[in-house]
């Protein structure tokens, strides 16, 4: 499903302003939606589906003022990560899956887990670590 005027619908989840600016420039002319937290992503993903391209970071919260958290079974507060966003993506029907996902995290362990889950769900996924110059 392409957006207006044949452009791609792109959803980006990252807590880094530099990355958001870079992706905005890279995808100029396309419909780009920027989310900074898991909660913003989950809402935008469900409301805007289907997406042509989704960009995901793993480590979220260290660069935003109010990071998303949850409490685990032992009562410890944990930060939401891109892996939580993957669960949202994998839960939708086949017709609502994104055409492609790019994991841009520099966290190799987190990125690999995300790529594995998305690939098992049948979503074309690549890992393209994005570091600041």
Language model regions located:
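Catalytic phosphate/metal-binding cores of nucleic-acid and nucleotide-processing enzymes, i.e., regions
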Residues: 1-133
């Amino acid at each position: 499903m392409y957006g207006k005027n044949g452009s791609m619908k792109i959803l980006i989840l990252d807590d880094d302003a530099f990355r958001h600016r870079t992706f905005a420039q890279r995808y100029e002319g396309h419909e780009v939606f920027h989310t900074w937290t898991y909660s913003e992503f989950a809402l935008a993903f469900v409301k805007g589906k289907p997406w042509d391209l989704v960009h995901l970071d793993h480590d979220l919260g260290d660069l935003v003022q109010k990071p998303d958290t949850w409490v685990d079974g032992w009562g410890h507060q944990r930060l939401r990560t891109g892996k939580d966003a993957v669960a949202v993506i994998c839960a939708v029907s086949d017709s609502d899956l994104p055409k492609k996902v790019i994991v841009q995290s520099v966290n190799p362990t987190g990125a690999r887990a995300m790529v594995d889950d998305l690939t098992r769900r049948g979503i074309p996924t690549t890992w393209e670590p994005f570091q600041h110059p």
